[in-house]
Design a protein with these regions (language model features):
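Active-site glycine-rich loops that stabilize anionic/oxyanionic intermediates
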Residues: 61, 67-72
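Gly/Ala-rich beta-loop-alpha elbow adjacent to hydrolase catalytic centers
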Residues: 160-165, 169
Length: 175
Protein backbone atom coordinates (compact mmCIF):
# COMPACT_ATOMS: atom_id res chain seq x y z
CA UNK A 1 0.00 0.00 0.00
CA UNK A 2 2.90 2.27 0.82
CA UNK A 3 4.33 1.70 -2.68
CA UNK A 4 0.97 2.68 -4.21
CA UNK A 5 1.02 6.01 -2.37
CA UNK A 6 4.58 6.69 -3.48
CA UNK A 7 3.70 5.96 -7.13
CA UNK A 8 0.61 8.19 -6.88
CA UNK A 9 2.68 10.99 -5.32
CA UNK A 10 5.29 10.77 -8.10
CA UNK A 11 2.61 10.87 -10.81
CA UNK A 12 1.01 13.96 -9.25
CA UNK A 13 4.47 15.54 -9.20
CA UNK A 14 4.64 15.17 -12.98
CA UNK A 15 1.35 16.99 -13.55
CA UNK A 16 2.52 20.35 -12.19
CA UNK A 17 5.64 20.67 -14.37
CA UNK A 18 3.54 19.82 -17.43
CA UNK A 19 1.07 22.61 -16.66
CA UNK A 20 3.95 25.00 -16.04
CA UNK A 21 5.09 24.86 -19.66
CA UNK A 22 5.64 28.22 -21.30
CA UNK A 23 2.37 29.81 -22.39
CA UNK A 24 2.03 32.31 -25.23
CA UNK A 25 0.88 35.74 -24.08
CA UNK A 26 -1.96 37.68 -25.60
CA UNK A 27 -0.76 41.23 -26.06
CA UNK A 28 -3.12 44.04 -26.94
CA UNK A 29 -1.51 47.20 -25.65
CA UNK A 30 0.82 49.15 -23.43
CA UNK A 31 0.27 51.10 -20.22
CA UNK A 32 1.38 54.71 -19.90
CA UNK A 33 1.30 57.50 -17.34
CA UNK A 34 1.27 61.27 -17.83
CA UNK A 35 1.32 64.02 -15.23
CA UNK A 36 -1.25 66.62 -16.24
CA UNK A 37 -0.36 70.21 -15.44
CA UNK A 38 -3.93 71.22 -16.31
CA UNK A 39 -5.58 68.72 -13.94
CA UNK A 40 -2.67 68.73 -11.49
CA UNK A 41 -2.65 64.94 -11.21
CA UNK A 42 -1.17 61.82 -12.72
CA UNK A 43 -3.32 60.25 -15.45
CA UNK A 44 -3.03 56.71 -16.73
CA UNK A 45 -3.85 55.60 -20.26
CA UNK A 46 -3.47 52.46 -22.33
CA UNK A 47 -2.64 52.28 -26.04
CA UNK A 48 -3.44 49.64 -28.64
CA UNK A 49 -1.73 49.97 -32.03
CA UNK A 50 -2.89 47.74 -34.93
CA UNK A 51 -0.46 45.16 -36.22
CA UNK A 52 1.44 46.39 -39.27
CA UNK A 53 0.99 44.12 -42.25
CA UNK A 54 3.68 43.35 -44.80
CA UNK A 55 4.23 46.31 -47.10
CA UNK A 56 2.58 48.81 -44.73
CA UNK A 57 5.70 50.14 -43.02
CA UNK A 58 5.20 53.73 -41.92
CA UNK A 59 1.39 53.57 -42.15
CA UNK A 60 -0.48 56.03 -39.90
CA UNK A 61 -3.85 55.32 -38.29
CA UNK A 62 -6.83 57.25 -36.89
CA UNK A 63 -6.94 57.46 -33.09
CA UNK A 64 -10.00 56.49 -31.04
CA UNK A 65 -9.93 58.08 -27.56
CA UNK A 66 -11.96 55.87 -25.24
CA UNK A 67 -13.30 57.41 -22.03
CA UNK A 68 -13.92 54.96 -19.17
CA UNK A 69 -11.09 53.08 -20.82
CA UNK A 70 -10.39 50.83 -17.86
CA UNK A 71 -13.86 49.32 -18.29
CA UNK A 72 -14.06 49.04 -22.08
CA UNK A 73 -10.52 48.78 -23.48
CA UNK A 74 -10.55 45.03 -24.16
CA UNK A 75 -13.98 44.99 -25.78
CA UNK A 76 -13.38 48.08 -27.94
CA UNK A 77 -10.00 46.77 -29.12
CA UNK A 78 -11.68 43.47 -30.01
CA UNK A 79 -14.46 45.33 -31.81
CA UNK A 80 -12.05 47.47 -33.85
CA UNK A 81 -9.84 44.50 -34.70
CA UNK A 82 -12.80 42.40 -35.85
CA UNK A 83 -14.54 45.07 -37.91
CA UNK A 84 -11.39 46.50 -39.48
CA UNK A 85 -10.50 43.03 -40.74
CA UNK A 86 -13.97 42.25 -42.08
CA UNK A 87 -14.47 42.54 -45.83
CA UNK A 88 -17.99 43.89 -45.27
CA UNK A 89 -16.95 46.76 -42.98
CA UNK A 90 -15.60 50.19 -43.82
CA UNK A 91 -14.01 50.68 -40.40
CA UNK A 92 -10.30 51.32 -40.87
CA UNK A 93 -7.76 49.87 -38.46
CA UNK A 94 -7.33 52.38 -35.65
CA UNK A 95 -5.27 53.10 -32.59
CA UNK A 96 -7.26 52.89 -29.34
CA UNK A 97 -6.27 55.14 -26.44
CA UNK A 98 -8.08 54.19 -23.24
CA UNK A 99 -8.24 57.08 -20.77
CA UNK A 100 -8.57 55.70 -17.24
CA UNK A 101 -10.78 57.41 -14.67
CA UNK A 102 -9.81 59.27 -11.54
CA UNK A 103 -12.99 61.32 -10.91
CA UNK A 104 -15.77 60.75 -13.47
CA UNK A 105 -18.19 63.30 -12.03
CA UNK A 106 -15.58 66.06 -11.99
CA UNK A 107 -14.12 65.30 -15.42
CA UNK A 108 -17.24 64.57 -17.45
CA UNK A 109 -19.84 67.06 -16.19
CA UNK A 110 -20.00 70.65 -17.44
CA UNK A 111 -21.51 72.23 -14.31
CA UNK A 112 -21.11 71.84 -10.58
CA UNK A 113 -24.17 70.59 -8.70
CA UNK A 114 -25.20 69.20 -5.31
CA UNK A 115 -28.40 67.67 -6.71
CA UNK A 116 -28.91 63.94 -6.41
CA UNK A 117 -30.20 61.71 -9.21
CA UNK A 118 -33.79 62.30 -8.13
CA UNK A 119 -33.25 66.09 -8.15
CA UNK A 120 -33.30 66.57 -4.39
CA UNK A 121 -30.63 68.55 -2.57
CA UNK A 122 -29.75 67.81 1.03
CA UNK A 123 -28.02 70.45 3.16
CA UNK A 124 -24.98 68.24 3.87
CA UNK A 125 -24.34 67.29 0.22
CA UNK A 126 -21.30 68.96 -1.31
CA UNK A 127 -21.47 70.20 -4.89
CA UNK A 128 -19.51 68.03 -7.34
CA UNK A 129 -18.57 68.07 -11.00
CA UNK A 130 -18.02 70.94 -13.35
CA UNK A 131 -14.54 70.02 -14.57
CA UNK A 132 -15.39 69.09 -18.16
CA UNK A 133 -13.68 72.17 -19.61
CA UNK A 134 -10.38 71.39 -17.86
CA UNK A 135 -10.62 67.72 -18.86
CA UNK A 136 -11.23 68.76 -22.48
CA UNK A 137 -8.11 70.94 -22.32
CA UNK A 138 -6.16 67.98 -20.90
CA UNK A 139 -7.27 65.76 -23.79
CA UNK A 140 -6.40 68.32 -26.47
CA UNK A 141 -3.34 70.07 -25.05
CA UNK A 142 -1.59 67.28 -23.18
CA UNK A 143 -2.80 63.76 -23.90
CA UNK A 144 -3.23 64.10 -27.67
CA UNK A 145 0.25 65.60 -28.04
CA UNK A 146 1.74 62.84 -25.88
CA UNK A 147 -0.03 60.11 -27.87
CA UNK A 148 0.91 61.58 -31.26
CA UNK A 149 4.58 61.51 -30.21
CA UNK A 150 4.33 57.78 -29.39
CA UNK A 151 2.20 56.28 -32.15
CA UNK A 152 1.75 56.59 -35.94
CA UNK A 153 -1.36 58.81 -35.83
CA UNK A 154 -2.78 60.26 -39.05
CA UNK A 155 -4.55 63.29 -37.52
CA UNK A 156 -8.08 61.82 -37.51
CA UNK A 157 -9.45 61.51 -33.98
CA UNK A 158 -12.59 59.97 -32.47
CA UNK A 159 -13.96 60.39 -28.96
CA UNK A 160 -16.09 57.59 -27.48
CA UNK A 161 -17.97 57.58 -24.18
CA UNK A 162 -21.19 56.53 -22.48
CA UNK A 163 -23.17 57.76 -19.48
CA UNK A 164 -21.29 60.75 -18.00
CA UNK A 165 -18.58 60.16 -20.62
CA UNK A 166 -21.31 60.26 -23.29
CA UNK A 167 -22.47 63.59 -21.87
CA UNK A 168 -18.90 64.86 -22.14
CA UNK A 169 -18.58 63.49 -25.69
CA UNK A 170 -21.78 65.21 -26.82
CA UNK A 171 -20.75 68.48 -25.15
CA UNK A 172 -17.38 68.27 -26.93
CA UNK A 173 -19.15 67.61 -30.24
CA UNK A 174 -21.53 70.56 -29.78
CA UNK A 175 -18.71 72.96 -28.92
Amino acid sequence: MKILYIILFIQIGWIFPLSAQKQDSIYIGTRHTLFSEILNEERKYWIYVPETKAGEKGKAYPVLYLLDGDSFFHSVVGFTRFFSSSKTSNLPPCIVVAVLNTDRTRDFTPTCSAARRDGTICPYDKPAGGGAEQFHRFLIEELRLEVENKVPANGTNFLVGHSYAGLFTLQTLSN
